């Protein structure tokens, strides 16, 4: 039964009513198209409303006159606005609703609202009267909407789809306008204002459902748009584009993390293409790595994206030979202020993240007591579906830049060892020594590590601070003892170290006497130390340290800083200006090879010159002060001196040979990459019991593994050892 059969039993009457409604279709469509051109004028909207009401009345009167009965308006609407023509209906109604939104924006314009920033209005045309007219337009527009929804057109079937399209289009326009007005950046507060404004507008036209139908799509559109420049925002421009990342975070929250998987894969692809290439310096990769940690941690509270993206960077960094040294330098120099703040604020909540990966295996860190107390276990949420096992756990969500950088090492022991070496280098340098900063930074490290792990660093720093106190006492002592020596006492600043706690220094034993002024100063310093520390004595490392010298050549004074081992030879030229190699060897008690190499270094620096006219073994003090180059502490290489065997216990290393078969199988079968670090093997060896009474140290284990590297049985890349697979016959 058709819709007209329900109105009357007369087929002839039904057909006449159908023909009459179809005849009104062209009249309605022509009126809609005509008045749409002038929709910004509310009078034209009134006229269109009148047309719709008149057509509806004519249809009803025709039905009564022809005996059709009481027809259903929806039946007539299907003939005039058929559902199959929905796209055309949406296009025809667009000018009306866009004009309404324009008047709504102008009527609601407030300069202090974020969404209205950047709008340029013609002050001559913008008056309170104009604003009142716009407000009246908004109110008078509703009868037209009601007529569309309930009148002869029954357009309520199309309205939700139409308003959804308009809202999506308006959102895109407003978002792009805000980005252009604020340096291509979409701030979350502005985006929220835009969405709230569109929601209120949908309420104004009594179409609230349309906004809720399309809002998720708008959030997805904005997230996808911002994702196109995600690499620059996250790894390059952070924190400049930080506000756009907050907008992305807001979109993820509103859409239940829709698109996060695709975004993660896209970002990993961008990282592999633009960052993880041979032409990018390790420092720049570390900078981008730290930026990714900070930005992605803020954008995604679950840290799923951060762990996936940073995991790719971390695996690449492990294959770079200079990563270990660059990380410790980056942490303690380039980013020390930011990391200091980060460490102090989050130290209590991330201690568990500092555990070794080996120690974390098999541990359910969701239920660590410390995490329960600090991370709010009562608000526990399950891990996201796209999270790798373990990445959503509280122990991983609490990580920060410091922890993520340290994780590249693979173990805390390696980080502490490298930090100890760097600290020794910086504390023993006279150029950039800063005990106060090192003390403050070490105190922060104590919040992340156990005291026993940093005990060596604590003692080293205490030695330096104590040495500064001795230096001050030495100044007073030198003034009182000046009359006891034939030469003036030159100032000395010494670093008194506890050799057991400091890294092994490259030194040489020499019996050569120091120059008389320097020896006198050393004697006074020794007396000063004995006054402070009874029953102790100093053992001077004569080849370590630097001397600040002032050379006067023909009235031109040149100030330079040179290492002690070279200054000893230079002081000889105060006695006479020309020396032979044999005379220097006899005077200093050094070998001929070492003597010649050090004299050649002085020649290279411009302090002395050879006199080939007299003899190739004759050395003369220079007469050209401009030829003396600038020398900084540590510039000469010690490798030019005589080869010295390392002081290691070879018996202890040989004793580890009995475990080589087990070691080879352990490394080959070690998951996931078939590689281990020396620290891990050290812990394994301790499980078996010490091969000797003292037991192997980490240095012994490292020496044993390096021996296997030299034999071609292992490879070592960035501190990780791997078995070299034997090639089969015919390969």
Swiss-Prot record:
* One annotated GO biological process: regulation of meiotic cell cycle
Q: What happens when the gene is disrupted?
A: RNAi-mediated knockdown results in defective metaphase to anaphase transition (Mat phenotype) and embryos that arrest at the one-cell stage.
Keyword set, alphabetical order: Cell cycle, Cell division, Developmental protein, Meiosis, Mitosis, Ubl conjugation pathway
Question: Has the keyword Cell cycle been applied to this entry?
Answer: yes
Repeat in keyword set: no
- Could you name the domain of life of the organism this protein comes from? Eukaryota
Q: Name one GO molecular function term.
A: ubiquitin protein ligase binding
Question: Which SMART domains does its entry note?
Answer: APC2, CULLIN
Q: Name one GO cellular component term.
A: anaphase-promoting complex
According to its UniProt record, in which pathway does this protein act? Protein modification; protein ubiquitination
Name the family: Belongs to the cullin family.
Q: What binding partners and quaternary form does the record give?
A: The APC/C is probably composed of at least 12 subunits: apc-2, apc-10, apc-11, cdc-26, emb-1, emb-27, emb-30, mat-1, mat-2, mat-3, such-1 and gfi-3.
Could you tell me which PANTHER family the record lists for this protein?
ANAPHASE-PROMOTING COMPLEX SUBUNIT 2
- What job does the chain carry out? Probable component of the anaphase promoting complex/cyclosome (APC/C), a cell cycle-regulated ubiquitin ligase that controls progression through mitosis and the G1 phase of the cell cycle. The APC/C complex acts by mediating ubiquitination and subsequent degradation of target proteins. Developmental role in early embryogenesis and the metaphase to anaphase transition in meiosis and mitosis.
Q: Output this protein's name.
A: Anaphase-promoting complex subunit 2
């Amino acid at each position: 039964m058709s819709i007209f059969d329900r109105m009357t039993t007369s087929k002839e009457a039904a057909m006449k009513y159908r023909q009459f409604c179809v005849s009104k279709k062209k009249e309605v469509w022509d009126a809609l198209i005509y008045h749409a051109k002038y929709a910004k004028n509310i009078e034209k909207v009134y006229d269109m409303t009148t047309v719709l009401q008149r057509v509806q009345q004519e249809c009803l009167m025709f039905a009564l006159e022809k005996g059709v009965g009481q027809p259903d308006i929806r039946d007539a609407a299907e003939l005039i606005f058929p559902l199959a023509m929905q796209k055309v209906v949406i296009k025809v109604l667009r000018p009306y609703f866009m004009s309404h939104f324009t008047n709504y924006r102008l009527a609601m314009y407030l300069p202090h609202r974020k969404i209205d920033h950047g709008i340029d209005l013609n002050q001559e045309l913008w008056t309170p009267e104009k604003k009142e007219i716009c407000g009246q337009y908004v109110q008078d527009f509703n009868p037209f909407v009601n007529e569309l929804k309930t009148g002869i057109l029954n357009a309520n079937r199309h309205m939700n789809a139409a308003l959804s399209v308009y809202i999506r289009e308006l959102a895109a326009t407003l978002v792009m306008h805000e980005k252009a007005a604020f340096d291509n950046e979409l701030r979350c507060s502005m985006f929220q204002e835009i969405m709230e404004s569109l929601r209120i507008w949908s309420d104004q036209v009594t179409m609230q459902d349309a906004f809720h139908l399309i809002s998720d799509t708008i959030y997805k559109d904005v997230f996808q748009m911002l994702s196109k420049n995600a690499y620059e925002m996250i790894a390059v421009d952070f924190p400049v584009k930080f506000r756009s990342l907050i907008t992305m975070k807001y979109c993820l929250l509103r859409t239940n993390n829709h698109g996060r998987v695709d975004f993660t894969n896209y970002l990993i692809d961008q990282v592999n293409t633009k960052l993880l290439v041979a032409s990018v310096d390790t420092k720049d990769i570390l900078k981008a790595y730290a930026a990714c940690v900070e930005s992605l941690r803020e954008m995604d509270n679950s840290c799923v994206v951060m762990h996936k993206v940073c995991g790719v960077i971390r695996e690449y960094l492990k294959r770079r030979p200079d990563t270990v040294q660059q990380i410790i330098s980056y942490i303690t120099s380039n980013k020390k202020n930011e990391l200091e703040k980060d460490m102090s604020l989050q130290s209590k909540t991330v201690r568990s993240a500092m555990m070794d990966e080996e120690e974390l295996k098999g541990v359910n860190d969701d239920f660590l007591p410390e995490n329960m107390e600090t991370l709010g276990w009562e608000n526990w949420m399950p891990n996201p579906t796209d999270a790798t096992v373990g990445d959503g756990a509280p122990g991983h969500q609490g990580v920060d830049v410091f922890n993520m950088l340290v994780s590249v090492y693979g173990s805390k022991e390696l980080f502490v060892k490298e930090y100890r070496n760097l600290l020794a280098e910086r504390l023993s340098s006279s150029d950039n020594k800063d005990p106060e900063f090192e003390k403050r930074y070490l105190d922060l490290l104590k919040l992340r590590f156990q005291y026993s792990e940093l005990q060596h660093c604590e003692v080293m720093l205490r030695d330096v601070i104590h040495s500064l106190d001795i230096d001050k006492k030495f100044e007073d002592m030198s003034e009182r003892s000046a009359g006891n020596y034939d030469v003036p006492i030159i100032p000395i600043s010494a670093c008194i170290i506890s050799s057991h706690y400091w890294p092994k220094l490259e030194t040489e034993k020499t019996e050569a006497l120091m120059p008389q002024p320097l020896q006198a100063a050393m004697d006074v310093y020794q007396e000063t130390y004995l006054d402070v520390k009874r029953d102790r004595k100093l053992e001077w490392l004569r080849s370590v340290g630097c001397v600040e010298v002032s050379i006067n050549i023909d009235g031109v004074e040149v100030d330079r800083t040179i290492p002690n081992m070279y200054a000893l030879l230079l002081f000889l030229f105060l006695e006479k200006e020309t020396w032979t190699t044999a005379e220097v060897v006899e005077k200093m008690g050094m070998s001929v090879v070492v003597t010649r190499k050090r004299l050649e270094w002085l020649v290279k620096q411009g302090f002395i010159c050879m006199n080939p006219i007299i003899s190739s073994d004759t050395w003369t003090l220079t007469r050209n002060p401009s030829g003396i180059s600038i020398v900084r502490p540590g510039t000469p290489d010690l490798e030019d001196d005589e080869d010295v065997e390392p002081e290691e216990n070879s018996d202890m290393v040989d004793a580890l040979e009995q475990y080589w078969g087990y070691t080879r199988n352990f490394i080959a079968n070690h998951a996931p990459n078939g590689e281990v670090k020396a620290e891990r093997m050290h812990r394994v060896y301790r499980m078996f019991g010490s091969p000797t009474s003292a037991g192997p140290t980490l240095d012994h284990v490292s020496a044993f593994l390096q021996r296997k590297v030299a034999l071609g049985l292992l490879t070592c890349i960035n501190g990780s050892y791997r078995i070299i697979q034997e090639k089969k016959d015919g390969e």
